[in-house]
């Protein structure tokens, strides 16, 4: 197991090094020289992925405009994902809702279902964590009512409802004394997320998974269980980085999640052998 962890650490180092071999300036220079539509979209996506703070939104919006012009659904999705992250994480609700509407209009099939469900889920999760009273109650009751008739829900709706309820239980545990039944219920909600996500292509399920694994590692009742979740956590991140679309995006891997997966695996090493 120690040898395995050493190999994993080397792999993590390779991710870090790869992100340092290219700079935003070199990508901007390459963008100025690019002549084909496809090259511009690929470079803009990498520029967006490697950017920080306000530059992410600037580059994502440029990518979105060029993806619209090229009518390229994948790059529309990539751009909208980062635009929506920026607006939702800074509670710019009107702007977020505007771009959710654009996603519903521009994207097709599972790309639309996945992205729209994920972003609405994050909006509702922020309501759970940062509000109280009627807004919070409305979100919770909506999820509970939906889950009473699961056959009417899409996999994405089931995932979103279970994730939101899991986060609500987690928030209550942090605010109050931890009750054994609450602890069990929170874990069950997150396990339900995994059960539904396994039915979907990783390309579309991925957004829902890293934080779910992070929470399940925290909920684990013993080091062996934590190690099992951490192994799946890490394999999911690495598997996603290896799908065809992501092989062209070496800077898109979330290093915070990758480090979290490695850390949970490392502290469970003795238990999982």
Describe the predicted segments one by one.
Residues 20-273:
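A "functional boundary" signal
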Residues 6-9:
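Sec-dependent N-terminal signal peptides
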Residues 1-4:
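Positively charged n-region of N-terminal signal peptides that target proteins for export
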Residues 17:
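Active-site helical microenvironments for divalent-metal-assisted chemistry
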Residues 13-14:
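N-terminal signal peptide c-region/cleavage motif recognized by signal peptidases
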């Amino acid at each position: 197991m120690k040898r395995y962890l050493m190999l994993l650490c080397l792999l993590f180092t390779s991710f870090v090094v790869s992100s340092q071999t290219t700079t935003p300036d070199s990508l901007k220079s390459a963008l100025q020289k690019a002549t084909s539509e496809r090259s511009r979209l690929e470079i803009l996506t990498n520029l967006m992925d490697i950017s920080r703070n306000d530059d992410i939104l600037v580059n994502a919006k440029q990518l979105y405009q060029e993806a619209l012009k090229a009518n390229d659904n994948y790059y529309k999705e990539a751009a909208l994902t980062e635009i929506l992250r920026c607006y939702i994480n800074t509670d710019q609700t009107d702007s977020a809702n505007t771009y959710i509407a654009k996603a519903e209009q521009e994207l097709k099939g599972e790309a639309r279902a996945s992205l729209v469900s994920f972003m609405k889920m994050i909006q509702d999760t922020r309501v759970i964590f940062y509000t109280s009273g009627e807004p919070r109650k409305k979100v919770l009751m909506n999820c509970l009512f939906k889950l009473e008739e699961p056959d009417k829900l899409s996999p994405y709706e089931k995932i979103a409802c279970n994730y939101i309820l899991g986060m609500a239980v987690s928030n209550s545990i942090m605010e109050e004394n931890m009750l054994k039944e609450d602890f069990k219920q929170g874990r069950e909600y997150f396990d339900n997320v995994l059960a539904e996500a396994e039915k979907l292509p990783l390309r579309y399920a991925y957004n829902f998974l890293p934080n779910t694994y992070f929470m399940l590692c925290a909920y684990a009742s013993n080091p062996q269980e934590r190690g099992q979740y951490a192994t799946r956590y890490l394999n999911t991140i690495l598997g996603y980085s290896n799908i065809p679309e992501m092989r062209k995006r070496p800077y898109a891997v979330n290093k915070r999640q990758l480090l979290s997966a490695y850390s949970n695996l490392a502290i469970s090493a003795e238990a999982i052998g």
